[in-house]
């Protein structure tokens, strides 16, 4: 079984590995076994569209993104390039496959699907704002310095594989504590707040599917006497 905890007799949170074929099967099995009414998934609308629409961006398009000042996308592209090479993506599943499996399995069973993650643009802009200048330079330099790497993935692949975010979190927190806090700690609080809001809004059974790296943080927030409230969630959605 995947790592998980039961918040109550009607709320279960399971943790997954974003490139694990085992996670895909485990997610499907849990949805079939838990008899939930709502499946909450660690996706925002933007990431869901990216995973389902095969969005592409060629090098000319990437240059346009850079010129428009969308530095967080450059940060993501560069970090994903390094992580993909390190991990090899040899698990046989598309990154984010278990999240899509959760959505698809829920829809096939006519269950409600809730996308509970903060918008990826907000997360990346807040992370970029927290990074020190030399950290930004290092990331941009790595982007420019990968030209001779024959194993480097195409830009189109990188943008399709946005769900490597969870596997990057601990590494990034060491590299840049400020940015790591945004990607890990803030999103732990945000995801917990969204789960708590769903729990309070009805008596329905809820199964939440999140990256395993968020599981302990979410559980800690849900066990606190003062869980993230609506005002705090709104604060976490503010662009810098």
Regions found by a protein language model. Give the residues of each.
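Compositional signal for N-terminal targeting/processing segments
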Residues: 1-240
């Amino acid at each position: 079984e995947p790592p998980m905890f039961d918040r109550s007799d009607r709320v279960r949170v399971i943790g997954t590995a974003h490139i694990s074929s085992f996670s895909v099967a485990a997610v499907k099995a849990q949805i079939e076994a838990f008899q939930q009414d709502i499946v909450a998934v660690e996706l925002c609308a933007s990431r869901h569209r990216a995973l389902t629409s095969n969005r592409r961006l060629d090098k000319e398009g990437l240059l346009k993104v850079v010129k428009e000042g969308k530095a967080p996308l450059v940060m993501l592209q560069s970090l994903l390039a390094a992580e993909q090479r390190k991990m090899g993506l040899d698990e046989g599943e598309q990154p984010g496959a278990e999240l899509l499996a959760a959505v698809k399995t829920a829809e096939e069973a006519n269950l409600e699907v809730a996308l509970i993650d903060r918008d990826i643009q907000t997360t990346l802009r807040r992370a970029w704002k927290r990074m020190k200048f030399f950290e930004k330079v290092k990331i941009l330099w790595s982007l420019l310095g990968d030209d001779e790497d024959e194993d480097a993935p195409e830009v189109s692949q990188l943008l399709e594989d946005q769900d490597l975010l969870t596997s990057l979190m601990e590494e990034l927190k060491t590299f840049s504590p400020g940015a790591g806090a945004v990607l890990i700690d803030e999103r732990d609080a945000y995801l917990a707040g969204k789960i708590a809001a769903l729990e309070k809004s009805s008596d329905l059974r809820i199964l939440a599917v999140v990256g395993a790296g968020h599981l302990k943080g979410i559980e800690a927030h849900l066990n606190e006497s003062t869980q993230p409230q609506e005002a705090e969630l709104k604060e976490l959605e503010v662009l810098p």
